[in-house]
Amino acid sequence: MPAVQLLLLACLLGGVGARTAQFQKANDRSGRCQYTFSVASPSESSCPEQGQAMLAIQELQRDSSEQRATLESTKARLSSLEALLHRLTSGQPAGPLETHQGLQRELEALRREREQLETQTQELESAYSNLVRDKSALEEEKRRLQAENEDLARRLESSSQEVASLRRGQCPQAHSSSQDVPSGSREVAKWNLENMDFQELKSELTEVPASQILKESPSGHPRNEEGGTGCGELVWVGEPITLRTAETITGKYGVWMRDPRAAFPYTGETTWRIDTVGTDIRQVFEYDHIRKFTQGYPSKVHVLPRPLESTGAVVYRGSLYFQAAESRTVLRYDLRTETLKAEKEIPGAGYHGQFPYSWGGYTDIDLAVDEIGLWVIYSTEAAKGAIVLSKLNPETLELEQTWETNIRKQSVANAFIICGTLYTVSSYSSPDATVNFAYDTGTGSSKALTVPFKNRYKYSSMIDYNPLERKLFAWDNFNMVSYDIKLSRL
């Protein structure tokens, strides 16, 4: 119907334009009045037939559909423009409309960022959990150490009170007199607890210098009051006993020691340990008790003011003696005050790989302790690589006496000193090595030996003698071991 109306309107307008319009009024058959308005077609001489009218109507319908499609397209574009205008007015940066590919890329980037954030979150949570566990372990260790400290404080206070009591005057005598007791009943009266006071026994402690107990024999070995030296030639070395294993690669080589002349606050059980793999070795781990040493709980960590070199360090009379890195200087470090007390350059001594033991490791200068005192084992150009042995003053590090042996230093794996006699070990890696040479400083002579020595872990980098325990201490391929020994009587 709209199409027909448009067609009639067009005809009407055309008729008006041509000024040929006619207006008629007449009654129809039923008597009703009808008005008729006629306009001549400007382009058609006669009216079209019914089929032609339908074609015109269909064309108008197609035009209407096309106009609707155009209108929908226009609406869509208008919506896009409105969206863009909204973005511009809301402060977002202007630019071309995002394509589907752009949105996909942005979505992928957001997904990657989310995955990275999730990974970082998991790592942080894991690190936090580890820190919480470490904190709990440290707090538990702190509580344990505090409890031990309190126990030690109580024991120290008790000991102080006991010493003070012992230092007071003579104990009071019994008030009852033996004269009041008949002679025939004196033996019985001694056990009459109802009428007799008790007496306290007084105990006095007297410090005696070691020089009064140990006197040197003509050979230079220490002698006790009965005349025996307590020394002899090494005749047997027992099987190694493993006390501890290092946890990290820095513990492949190392040195561990106890003080045979310990002074307060240290005891014969206080143990020190140094891992010697690295270029800047300064940490010295201290353990109050053997149990803490075997369990791996240091009570203190010293940081040396100068780095040390290799495995030749020893502890003696409360001080750590060691070779300074890349030098022929020997240092004395006071463990109580944590300060350097003395240093001395060993004249002509090879260092940093000039005259090491056969296993290497910059073992040019090796310190040792025995019943007589502090020693240093080394070699020089003048000695042509043979072992040189010097007795050191433990306070000043001055050389007191020097011996040159006929044992080539690089031909042996390690050396130690017992009662003034130098002993060497044939191999650092063979399971069935031997103690193969002995040099007696008392007589200035050497001889070959064949005392079996076991390298259980096949890489012994340190062997030292502890005169207090009469044992050998060794570091064998991450493992800290000890050996029982036997000496023949002189």
UniProtKB/Swiss-Prot annotation:
Post-translational modification: Palmitoylated.
Keywords: Calcium, Cell projection, Cilium, Coiled coil, Cytoplasmic vesicle, Disulfide bond, Endoplasmic reticulum, Extracellular matrix, Golgi apparatus, Lipoprotein, Membrane, Metal-binding, Mitochondrion, Mitochondrion inner membrane, Mitochondrion outer membrane, Palmitate, Secreted, Signal
GO biological process, one term: negative regulation of Rho protein signal transduction
Expressed in which tissues: The myocilin 35 kDa fragment is detected in iris and ciliary body.
Main location: secreted
PROSITE patterns per the UniProt record, alphabetical: OLF
SUPFAM superfamilies recorded: Myosin rod fragments
Record-given protein name: Myocilin
Gene that encodes the chain: MYOC
